[in-house]
């Protein structure tokens, strides 16, 4: 019967998996066999032969035994893809061709990146801040004005008007008129002196955070400029009251102070010859009150500088905190990515193991089918049948039966090659022997005839003499 197959012996020879005159080991229904591949692609063993290069066939004497079996070829060399698995299923009977079932590799499902909790918290905080900003009205200017004019009118107006940005927004005039309504309406006018600093033009900004930042920056710049003005005023007043020194540092400092236009304005506006020298309550005629006034001014300047430094330190601390938070977020992201990669690797390993288990299960099922088929057909390969070349009949096992783990265990020595039937090689040897025998017989007959001829000629010569 023809064992219809997808892979033929000729294909295996073409691929280089098997070669002519190569010993082949295979198993059928748990029984191991050995054979030799001939030049035409046939496999001959003791009682079992696979013939016909286009199909794997074997001759059955007796009933048709249907079932499944595996042929395992060992010692074959070829491409690595074909070299990994040398198991070929074949079917006994003429019911149809085998279709190879190729299992699709299950691609490991990549886990979808879940949003990180830190990013969600940041987004929620931003949304809450935006809602709070939308709910709060922008009453910064009104609040600043109300806080400013709660103070007494006798205090310095330059320190009071720092937090108000109305004059910066307009930038047209330095004179301001503000009205405060109480039980008795009073109008107070404050004149600002022309200051040498340049005013920063304010751009229209809709974001309230940026407005607050600009206000803080403007306040800081104003405080710095005022502190510089106070220091320059004090230096000028000290130079006027101190005797002239001969040191080169004093000469250079006076030259630098007189060269700048700002110092000239300050000197002219706050000097002893100016009209505004009584604005700060300084009496230049009395020597007793001058050092106290200077000390008070120094203290005020130091306080302003300290406030500026504190603000700068706060800003630096905020920046450092932000940087630390960013670094922590980056580290968390890296750790999450590493965990995801390790999970992917584990999934791949699990999938590979599952595939291996599935293949093993298929092989086990195939073996079970073999046993079931043999049991379902009691007439096939029964002890009374003529199936003498197969190993299903355990009562009468064949002489060439080997252990079941013959092919799977590569450490066992190969069994002896069984006696092969009459082949072309033995025919040629017999023919050569026959030819040699015939030639020897002919040569012997020729030598005998020659000796007979010589003896006859000798006898004739003797008779003539």
UniProtKB/Swiss-Prot annotation:
Residues 214-242 form a coiled coil. Keywords: Coiled coil. InterPro entries: RAMA. It comes from the Eukaryota. Residues 156-169 have a biased composition (Acidic residues). The keyword Coiled coil applies. Residues 95-377, 392-465 are annotated as: Disordered. Residues 264-294, 392-407 have a biased composition (Polar residues). Residues 6-91 form the RAMA domain. The keyword Coiled coil applies. Residues 117-137, 177-190, 226-263, 295-376, 424-442 have a biased composition (Low complexity). Residues 208-220 have a biased composition (Basic and acidic residues). Residues 443-465 have a biased composition (Basic residues). This is Putative uncharacterized protein DDB_G0272516. The lineage of its organism: Eukaryota, Amoebozoa, Evosea, Eumycetozoa, Dictyostelia.
């Amino acid at each position: 019967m023809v064992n219809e197959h997808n892979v033929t012996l000729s294909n295996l020879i073409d691929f280089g998996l098997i070669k002519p005159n190569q010993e082949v080991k295979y198993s059928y229904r748990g029984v191991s066999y050995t054979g030799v591949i001939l030049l035409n692609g046939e496999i001959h063993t003791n009682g079992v032969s696979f013939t016909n290069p286009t199909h794997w066939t074997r001759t059955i004497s007796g009933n048709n035994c249907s079932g499944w079996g595996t042929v395992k070829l060992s010692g074959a060399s070829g491409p690595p893809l074909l070299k990994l698995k040398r198991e070929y299923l074949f079917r006994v009977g003429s019911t149809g061709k085998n279709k190879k079932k190729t299992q699709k590799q299950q691609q490991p499902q990549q886990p979808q990146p879940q949003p990180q909790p830190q990013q969600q918290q940041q987004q929620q905080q931003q949304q809450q801040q935006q809602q709070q900003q939308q709910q709060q009205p922008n009453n910064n200017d009104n609040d600043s004005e109300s806080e400013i004019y709660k103070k007494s009118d006798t205090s310095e107006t330059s320190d009071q008007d720092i937090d108000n940005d109305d004059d910066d927004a307009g930038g047209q005039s330095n004179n301001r008129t503000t009205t405060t309504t109480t039980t008795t309406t009073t109008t107070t006018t404050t004149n600002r002196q022309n200051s040498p600093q340049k005013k920063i033009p304010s751009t229209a900004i809709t974001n309230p955070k940026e407005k607050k930042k600009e206000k803080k920056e403007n306040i800081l710049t104003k405080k710095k400029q005022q502190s510089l003005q106070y220091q320059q005023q004090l230096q000028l007043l000290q130079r006027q009251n101190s005797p002239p020194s001969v040191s080169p540092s004093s000469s250079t400092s006076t030259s630098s102070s007189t060269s700048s236009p700002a110092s000239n304005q300050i000197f002219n506006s706050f000097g002893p010859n100016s009209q505004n020298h009584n604005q700060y309550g300084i009496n230049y005629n009395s020597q007793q009150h001058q050092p106290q006034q200077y000390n008070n001014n120094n203290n005020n300047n130091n306080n302003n500088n300290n406030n500026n430094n504190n603000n700068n330190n706060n800003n630096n601390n905020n920046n450092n905190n932000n940087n630390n938070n960013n670094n922590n977020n980056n580290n968390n992201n890296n750790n999450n990515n590493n965990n995801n990669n390790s999970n992917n690797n584990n999934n791949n390993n699990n999938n590979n193991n599952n595939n291996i288990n599935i293949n093993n299960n298929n092989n086990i099922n195939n073996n079970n089918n073999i046993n079931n088929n043999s049991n379902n057909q009691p007439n096939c390969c029964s002890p009374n049948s003529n199936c003498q070349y197969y190993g299903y009949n355990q009562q009468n096992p064949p002489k060439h039966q080997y252990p079941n783990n013959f092919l799977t265990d590569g450490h066992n020595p190969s069994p002896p090659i069984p006696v092969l039937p009459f082949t072309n090689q033995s025919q040629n040897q017999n023919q050569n022997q026959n030819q040699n025998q015939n030639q020897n017989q002919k040569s012997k007959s020729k030598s005998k005839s020659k000796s007979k001829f010589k003896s006859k000629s000798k006898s004739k010569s003797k008779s003539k003499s």
